[in-house]
């Protein structure tokens, strides 16, 4: 199965909205840094080839990663995208650990959202 996505957000109205709330950095993104002052907008796309682990092993594929758990959250009842819920983030990560059968202390890498905003970084 191929799974892909794109993010096209550089239209003027979107840029203006993030700029108006002070979410955009005037220089560069520095997530989880005391000097963080917002993020830099960008666009991108990606596609992954997903396959059952047993099939990939049987086919002799060069396996780069295994998805063992997934957790998600939506802050629809909260203040919205600009003020993420710490509770929701904790629930999402807890679900992923539970599905994967891992303890948090065994995780070696976390791919964070890293918005370089005070609220977003503090929540993560």
Can you describe what each PLM-predicted range is?
Residues 1-124:
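Condensing-enzyme catalytic core of the thiolase-fold
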